[in-house]
Amino acid sequence: MPTVKQLIRNARQPIRNARKTAALKGCPQRRGTCARVYNPKKPNSALRKVARVRLTSGFEITAYIPGIGHNLQEHSVVLVRGGRVKDLPGVRYRIIRGTLDAVAVKNRQQGRLQYGVKKPKK
């Protein structure tokens, strides 16, 4: 327990919470270029795809590619948002479908917003 004199000399510092998406530098999204597109190693290899993305903020991150099927390859320009994937350790970002080089998911009827699909014509 510090003395009153010690507290006057240097006040208590508030505990700062660490950001979960440091690579975005406080922005809601960041643009980046795919360095490599691959499947995660065993035991998470299932049918999931991830990409190493070099962001405009200078970070190189691992981002999840949501939805069924994608057109991403090396040098594709993508938009990245925060949001972790529970069963893939170290994957704390997601690629936004339907923007830049990442096309929307085909034949998607429900939950379209997450996958960049426009409202179908009646």
UniProtKB/Swiss-Prot annotation:
Subcellular location: Plastid, Chloroplast
Main location: plastid
Record GO terms (molecular function): rRNA binding; structural constituent of ribosome
SUPFAM superfamilies with a match to the protein in the record: Nucleic acid-binding proteins
Subunit and interaction comment: Part of the 30S ribosomal subunit.
GO cellular component: a single term: chloroplast
Keywords (A to Z) from UniProt: Chloroplast, Plastid, Ribonucleoprotein, Ribosomal protein, RNA-binding, rRNA-binding
PROSITE patterns hit by this protein: RIBOSOMAL_S12
Record carries keyword Chloroplast: yes
NCBIfam families (alphabetical): rpsL_bact
Pfam families membership: Ribosom_S12_S23
Family membership: Belongs to the universal ribosomal protein uS12 family.
Functional description taken from the UniProt entry: With S4 and S5 plays an important role in translational accuracy. Located at the interface of the 30S and 50S subunits.
InterPro entries in the cross-refs: NA-bd_OB-fold, Ribosomal_uS12, Ribosomal_uS12_bac
Protein name, entry field: Small ribosomal subunit protein uS12cz/uS12cy
Gene Ontology BP term (one): translation
